[in-house]
Amino acid sequence: GVWLRPRYYKRGNENLFEGSKREAKNVRTNVGVCDVTTLGKIDIKGPDAAELLNRVYTNAWLKLPVGKARYGVMLREDGIVMDDGTTTRISENHYHMTTTTAQAANVLSHLEYYLQLVWPELNVNVVSTTEQWAGAAIAGPKSRDLLQKLFPNSDVSNEGLPFMGYMEGDLFGVKARIYRISFSGELAYEVNVESDYGNFMWEKIIEVGEEFNIQPYGTEALSTLRIEMGHVAGSELDGRTIPFDNALEGLVSKKKDFIGKRSLQRSAFTAEAVSYTHLRAHETVGN
């Protein structure tokens, strides 16, 4: 559907730049919460689920443990980056894939096409769950303290919920999925609940987070934070780039096959061209 998200949460007479800078700085110093419900979500189930992921992503997926997430890059047949995102192994034959908001429908169609016409032998079912789950990203140095208050019966310590880890928890009587994933470079988590409880989740996060100086942040601050982290998104994945353009060559397997692998070997793609480069700023939003 058509998603609407605030670019920033205005205070007083703030303009976009002032408001987003305040929000980003608060994430760097305290804790912030951002609505990430718009991310595409796809349930992948079946004994061949891992094999499907291994074929559509450029990196390896056959040995991902239950309760862990992994970042992956998906290519078109011509080698161009189609999408990126994290996929979590919920149980033995059950995976939860997230996609970018813009490519959610295209990725689902991509998977269905290959399962129906190219790999009909794979025993896998894929279904969109984008509208079934509401999501909130909780980011900042105080995010774990807040999470422990939200889920007092869960071990969200570094040992109990390591980076790229997953667990289920009870959010004041509501079943929740908890992922330790960061889009900002700070300690961060994503919490998902059934969409009917989305407002309830948001209100509880704001209420409990008051003692940690929580502030909601919009898409403008989100973009600023991800740029500072060096995470690719948006203009770097505009349908004209390959993994090597975005410093993602470490995710391209040299052993296994995947969609788009042969195209990456074309001379036009192996020659030096554009390169993803980080710049050190004199002042970041957190200073």
Where in the sequence are the language-model features?
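N-terminal low-complexity segments that are often proline-rich with Ser/Thr-Pro
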Residues: 285-287
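Acidic, proline/glycine-enriched N-terminal capping motif
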Residues: 1-75, 80-82
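Well-ordered mid-protein domain cores that form the structural environment of catalytic cofactors
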Residues: 63-93, 98-113
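Conserved, structured C-terminal
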Residues: 1-21, 91-283
